[in-house]
Amino acid sequence: MDVSALLTSAGINIAICVVLVSLYSILRKQPANYCVYFGRLLSDGRVKRHDPRWYERFAPSPSWLVKAWETTEEEMLAAAGLDAVVFIRMVICSIRIFSIVAVVCLAFVLPVNYYGQKMEHKEVHLESLGVFTIENLNPRSRWLWVHCLSLYIISSAACALLYFEYKNIAKKRLAHISGSASKPSHFTVLIRAIPQSPDQSYSETVSKYFTNYYAPSYVSHLMVYRDGFIHRLMNETERMCQAIKHVSPDLSCNPSLKSCVLCGPAATNSFQIISNETDSVKGLELGELTLTTTEEERPVAFVFFKSRYDALVVSEVLQTPNPMLWVADLAPEPHDVHWRNLRIPYRQLWMRRIATLVGAIAFMFVFLFPVTFVQGLTQLPTLSKNFPFLKDLLNRRFMEQVITGYLPSVILVLFFYTVPPLMMYFSTLEGCVSRSQRKKSACLKILYFTIWNVFFVNILSGSVIRQFTVLNSVRDVPAQLAKLVPAQAGFFMTYCFTSGWAGLACEIMQPVGLIWNLIAKVIVKNKEESYETLRFPYHTEIPRLLLFGLLGFTNSVIAPLILPFLLIYFFFAYLIYKNQIINVYITKYESGGQYWPVFHNTTIFSLILSQVIALGFFGLKLSTVASGFTIPLILLTLLFSEYCRQRFAPIFQKYPAEILIAMDRADEMTGKMEEIHNNLKVAYSQIPTCSEESSKAGCTSPCSDQELPDSEELKPEKENLKADYIWEFQRSKSGLDLEVKSCPSASPIRNSPGFAEIYKRT
């Protein structure tokens, strides 16, 4: 690839970014798009719907950039939680590291590479990108010490910044733990693989076991029931309420003058009845509700203890000599529980993990074919030879630049859109009991997949057979990487343009949400001001951020021309991600900063990989002095990684007993323990309820990951048909085991069996 092809790709992507960002600055001002670009603020009720002047609404403005820049870390922590702060700290750490890397490499390494004597120089726009790489140096060049010294500076700066950031994030996590005093998960242990007894139920078995062995600390427990029936009933009832809500007020809000056989004549308003029923449900205490149906108990229970320390001890010790029974773990937060996966038998989990690992590896190798095809596009002689009918087209200068500089990265990015949903599906099949754990598992899978396919497969590709041939010679891996990385420097730059710059522009534009909102408002004619609240996609954005960090480290002393483009990406990411976090995405669950070890370990891996590649290149250039100095650098980096693992990693894996005991003593002194114990069953109940405050913002149950989609607007002539169908469906699902109270209205169309009628007071 030459400079003109690189500039063509950069120009196309810059134009795309400018257009999308300009459109965003206009579309975000339109009141009809508030639900797309201000979802989090709308859910908090903090957006005032006002129409600015017409000429201001259609003029691009950088006000959102100023707002994102001025948002402090404390504001983000209060609004979006610790995970959002940790993610922004990842971006900031990347900016700091690569600012130093860019200054060192652009000031010293790049001039040395460019003025090497191995390649012949041409006009600037016709220059091959190889003249900017270390390949342009002759063997035994006396300038290789510049690369070795730069590698030492880069490694020292990166390790120092990583250490201080790790220390800072660890303090934030400890503050997060001590600051969440009323979290029910600190008092709760999730017990799985409860043994079945022919003489008693699972609930009785749990009560007997913990009363026997943990009598001083055991409070109570809550069994997990088969969720299929409960969720279907709740979802259909919610849909019926949505359907009635969307009915035209002229037809639905008039008082009903029909008489009821049981209740007598009454002039009632159907919507007023539903409102009153909802208020009565909210008045019930969930701790007083039990299932009246014959729901099947699962061998899973939430067990509550008197103190945080008691729950911590129970979760850490082995309960029985058989480790496959009475498996105890600290429970996730109520809104973080993945209720559907709790029904998976514990003995199946290890088989599921193996199966998903095999499936992910198989998909990784299947993905070799599109990656190899993409690499074929970058080789014009091979492309002309295999497709003779394209020869005339490829001889045109502009088409050559587009095909070699822009098209390969676009095709690869499009193929990668299939990866996150599949990896999330694999993580769900693993049986993760919490949604944050599932998202972190998907993040790791996507990270490994991305590094393997974008970096290793691309630099080793010629054909699938040749890749296996190269990988068989493990001893020659550093030398092979040193030969192939400079050759792919141009592709990595164009991938930074397409996946990095243009990807961020698409992220802020939210094209899927915008199109969906347009369909709902224009085609479906939905006048309801509804919106879907989204969660931040850590499982896709963290791997992307780390991939560009890997490309920056591995190309720093080999092909430093990529560094300014990466810095632009990181600065752009800092502003856009902050804007999205404070305006668009909501936080219903989080991992407590557990993504930071992923960032730290991957950055260390990237740093060591860059040192190994440099070692291989010093060997190819026959520089024994530079090779000798690089080996101790690799060992020192490994020692630093091990120190950080011993010093900081346990903080992100376990809770410190010292902090939990201090929190227990503080709650005992203030008399909060009894209140916390009374709320434990309410928090982990499978029955969803809304408080007055949460109902204003659109409450969701702990069982659901996303809000229910709004029903389509009903036509007046189809009102009775739709309502009759829902009513009959509810009655058929209820069966004879449910006690459904009669409604004061004459028509069943205008009523729904509330949740208070499905359950009774104990």
From Swiss-Prot:
The keyword Membrane applies. GO terms for molecular function: calcium-activated cation channel activity. The chain crosses the membrane at residues 3-23, 90-110, 144-164, 354-374, 402-422, 445-465, 500-520, 557-577, 594-614, 615-635. It is a multi-pass membrane protein. InterPro entries: Csc1-like, CSC1/OSCA1-like_7TM, CSC1/OSCA1-like_cyt, Csc1/OSCA1-like_N. Belongs to the CSC1 (TC 1.A.17) family. Acts as an osmosensitive calcium-permeable cation channel. This is Hyperosmolality-gated Ca2+ permeable channel 2.2. It comes from Arabidopsis thaliana (Mouse-ear cress). The gene is OSCA2.2.
